Amino acid sequence: MDPPAIEHPRFAKPQRVAFVQACWHRDVVEEARIAFMKEAEARHLTHVDVFEVPGSFEIPLHAQILAKTRRYTAIVAAGLVVDGGIYRHEFVADTVIKALMDVQLRTEVPVFSAVLTPQQFHETEVHYDFFRRHFAIKGVEVAEACANTLLGLERLRGQVAAGIA
């Protein structure tokens, strides 16, 4: 028997979300998108546009351009940055996360990250299976964070407009 469905709060105004997904390790990263879309719909985020970029490094520029259009009330980024043995992958990951934070602070459009950087990732079926499951969990978590933040911002902006905050 399934547990009763949870009724999530509804938004006062329609929300439109951009989901920017890196194609590097697509079979892993797309699990976040699939889980996000399902959870987002349950949370009344029904307008989601999906954009693909080659890798995680390309996500911040796309996020910034999308934020500047003012079409989107939120942007979600998903990618996998792994140690390929040549470059210091944590520098790439750090740069991407800082750039995403800069985008949201400059544009006041919230940006959520499901860009993950495991300490170890080996191209074995065991690691692929683990990270597919992990990205599915992160997809749900980022949908929860997105919906809750948008509800909070909607409330806060209403209070600011009313002179309460």
From Swiss-Prot:
Q: Which SUPFAM superfamilies match?
A: Lumazine synthase
Q: Where is the active site?
A: R88 (proton donor)
Return the EC number: 2.5.1.78
Q: Which GO terms describe its molecular function?
A: 6,7-dimethyl-8-ribityllumazine synthase activity
- Choose one Gene Ontology CC annotation of this protein and give it: cytoplasm
Under the heading InterPro entries, the entry gives: LS, LS/RS, LS/RS_sf
Keywords for this protein: Riboflavin biosynthesis, Transferase
Which reaction(s) does its UniProt entry say it catalyses? (2S)-2-hydroxy-3-oxobutyl phosphate + 5-amino-6-(D-ribitylamino)uracil = 6,7-dimethyl-8-(1-D-ribityl)lumazine + phosphate + 2 H2O + H(+)
Pathway terms, separated by semicolons? Cofactor biosynthesis; riboflavin biosynthesis; riboflavin from 2-hydroxy-3-oxobutyl phosphate and 5-amino-6-(D-ribitylamino)uracil: step 1/2
Give GO BP annotations, semicolon-separated: riboflavin biosynthetic process
Binding site residues for (2S)-2-hydroxy-3-oxobutyl phosphate: H127
Q: What does this protein do?
A: Catalyzes the formation of 6,7-dimethyl-8-ribityllumazine by condensation of 5-amino-6-(D-ribitylamino)uracil with 3,4-dihydroxy-2-butanone 4-phosphate. This is the penultimate step in the biosynthesis of riboflavin.
Q: Which family does it belong to?
A: Belongs to the DMRL synthase family.
Could you identify this protein by its name?
6,7-dimethyl-8-ribityllumazine synthase 2
Q: Give the organism the record lists.
A: Bradyrhizobium diazoefficiens (strain JCM 10833 / BCRC 13528 / IAM 13628 / NBRC 14792 / USDA 110)
